[in-house]
């Protein structure tokens, strides 16, 4: 993961998934260094992977504020949304053209995902990890596509169990256990208060009913904009992209 330090001109490329892992930050020069990671350019390249086109099909792969000028079709579309995006709109702002549109259904969009064309849902069911299809039609100025994609809670499990000898390295005897990351939509959620493996345990049911979502109530933009939080008992979980200090995001389950 490439991230920027909130207070300094520093970047991080990757860091361990282990207990109480903290992001290692590179130097404070604008150039940074290759040994600190080669992904610093990622943030200005997302737009290159937002849309793809063939002769008569437009694929929408990412949901982010962008403007698409499709020269071959002489048409312009503008996408608007907040980030993180639980909804987005795509509007034809200039031109007319005939084509099909395919919109990505994220893997985590298992409940409540919907696509509306000019106010009417295009389907009653959407398959995660696929594309929702608006068949070939004549698009014109002011046509609007609305995408709704509520974040869902789920666990991203590791490929195998955490051995007891590893789990017990901090002096506590722990049994072999499955491990994984608590997810909210596309975001890995980190606990803000965990310092040893005995605390890094999630006691959950299959529906994650004990975990509640705290909707953002602060600013919608900026460093803390649109910040979603999860709670379990007295424990707080925040998105990993937001945390720059203690960032335990790997739990015994």
Label every PLM stretch briefly.
Residues 90-98:
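Extracellular and analogous surface-interaction loops
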Residues 102, 146-149:
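Extended Gly/Ser/Thr-rich low-complexity repeat segments
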Residues 110-135, 155-163:
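Solvent-exposed beta-strand/loop surfaces of large extracellular or lumenal domains
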Residues 1-91, 127, 148-253:
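C-terminal beta-rich recognition modules with glycine/proline-rich loops and embedded aromatic residues
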Residues 97-107:
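Surface-exposed beta-strand/loop patches in extracellular or lumenal glycoproteins
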């Amino acid at each position: 993961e490439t991230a920027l330090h909130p207070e300094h001109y520093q970047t991080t490329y990757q860091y361990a998934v282990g207990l109480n892992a903290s992001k290692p930050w590179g130097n404070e020069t604008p150039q940074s260094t290759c040994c600190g990671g080669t992904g610093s350019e990622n943030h200005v390249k997302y737009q290159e992977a937002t849309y793809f086109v063939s002769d008569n099909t437009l694929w929408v792969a990412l949901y982010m504020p962008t403007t698409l000028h499709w020269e071959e079709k002489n048409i312009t579309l503008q996408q608007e949304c907040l980030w993180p995006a639980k909804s987005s709109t795509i509007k034809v702002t200039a031109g007319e053209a005939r084509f099909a549109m395919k919109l990505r259904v994220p893997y985590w969009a298992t409940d409540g995902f919907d696509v509306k064309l000019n106010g009417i849902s295009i389907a009653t069911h959407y398959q995660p990890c696929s594309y929702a299809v608006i068949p070939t039609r004549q698009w014109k100025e002011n046509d609007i596509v609305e995408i709704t994609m509520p974040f869902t809670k789920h666990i991203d499990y590791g490929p195998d169990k955490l051995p007891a000898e590893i789990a017990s390295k901090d002096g506590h005897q722990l049994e072999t256990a499955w491990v994984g990351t608590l997810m909210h939509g596309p975001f890995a959620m980190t606990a803000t208060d965990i310092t040893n493996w005995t605390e890094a345990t999630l006691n959950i049911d299959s529906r994650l009913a004990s975990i509640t979502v705290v909707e953002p109530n602060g600013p919608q933009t900026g460093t803390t904009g649109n910040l979603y939080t999860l709670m379990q008992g007295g424990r707080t979980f925040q998105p990993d992209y937001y945390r720059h200090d203690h960032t335990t995001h790997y739990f015994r389950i």
